[in-house]
Amino acid sequence: MSTQIMRQLWSIIEATQVVTLLQMDDTSLVQWLVKQTSKQVLLESHELDFLGEYIKTRLTLIRDLADERSN
């Protein structure tokens, strides 16, 4: 996955309201983040799959960062 896609994903995470990141279930959050990223960066199907898997492995980190922002 390109650095452009990674930067865009983390930019989206930072810009997303904390309540969204904390209250969505895992599957919905992964799908939502993939969709938001694909709106801004043209992704091929294998990149969509990889991005979804990457997000799944980072959900704890994403939620921890969101929790920090809420305090």
Model-identified regions with their sequence ranges:
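N-terminal acidic leader/helix
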Residues: M1-S28, R63
